[in-house]
């Protein structure tokens, strides 16, 4: 379990987060939504350990491995697909050459990039770049994956396809996932639970359980799906 307790964050004069509490069970997919500037990305970065809270704490399982997928794919243009996927492994000790090759091959296959190992970022579409960013995190076999609006820069059709692929990966690999997005439909499609935050200083004002077992294109036209999307959208407008 990941446990967020009383987390508050100030940036100089800006009060970004206000006493946020959140428990996320192992293997759960939780999405955080809220108005722009409410602190949802700040909360995600605090959970990741990239920044420290002003007050409060985050507890994660001992020796658990996490990975972060940013909004910008942040690929190195002089490295090909295989070498970009290897980047995080170079920062960690203990990986043999054989294990690196095996993990990279598996991760690229999982995200549909097999056959593109020698391609460079400028040769990839926006969707392929995001797949590579995801593969770069998957090579670590993370216990939890934190995703900060990773699909915001791709077109709608690609976005929906990637949502299905992310959900399939999560089901297969059984990692804990925490996503930040502005897209309520995306939040409902991917998640077990959606967390709604208030305007800044952000705090959690509402949570919605999402009951659907099957996640495919047909779900988007399900009246129950639309009802949950509307419920969350209504909370964001209040």
Predicted segments, located by residue:
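Conserved signature/switch motifs of ABC ATPase nucleotide-binding domains
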Residues: 119-122, 140
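Helix-to-loop junction immediately C-terminal to a conserved catalytic motif
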Residues: 48
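Hydrophobic anchor residue at the start of the ABC signature
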Residues: 134
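The feature captures the beta-strand-to-loop junction immediately N-terminal to the Walker
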Residues: 33-35
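Catalytic Walker B motif of ABC-type/P-loop ATPase nucleotide-binding domains
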Residues: 145-148
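Short helical segment in ABC ATPase nucleotide-binding domains corresponding to the A-loop/adjacent helical element
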Residues: 82-90, 98-101, 105, 209
């Amino acid at each position: 379990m990941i446990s967020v307790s009383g987390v508050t964050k100030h940036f100089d004069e800006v009060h970004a987060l206000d006493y946020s509490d959140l428990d996320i069970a192992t293997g759960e997919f939780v999405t955080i939504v809220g108005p722009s500037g409410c602190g949802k990305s700040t909360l995600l970065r605090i959970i990741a350990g990239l920044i420290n809270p002003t007050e409060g704490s985050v507890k994660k399982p001992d020796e658990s491995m996490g990975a972060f997928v940013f909004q910008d794919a942040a690929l190195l243009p002089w490295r090909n697909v295989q070498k970009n996927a290897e980047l995080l492994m170079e920062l960690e000790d203990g990986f043999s050459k054989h294990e690196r090759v095996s993990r990279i091959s598996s991760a690229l296959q999982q995200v549909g990039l097999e056959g593109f190992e020698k391609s460079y970022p400028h040769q990839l579409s926006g969707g392929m770049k995001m797949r590579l960013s995801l593969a770069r995190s998957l090579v670590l076999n993370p216990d939890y994956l934190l995703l900060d609006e990773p699909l915001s820069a791709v077109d709608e059709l690609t976005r929906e396809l990637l949502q299905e692929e992310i959900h399939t990966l999560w089901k297969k690999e059984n990692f804990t996932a925490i996503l930040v997005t502005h897209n309520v439909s995306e939040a409902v499609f991917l998640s077990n639970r959606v967390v709604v935050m208030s305007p800044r200083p952000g705090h959690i004002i509402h949570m919605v359980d999402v009951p659907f077992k099957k996640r495919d294109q047909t779900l988007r036209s399900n009246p129950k799906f639309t009802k949950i999307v509307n419920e969350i959208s209504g909370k964001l407008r209040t």
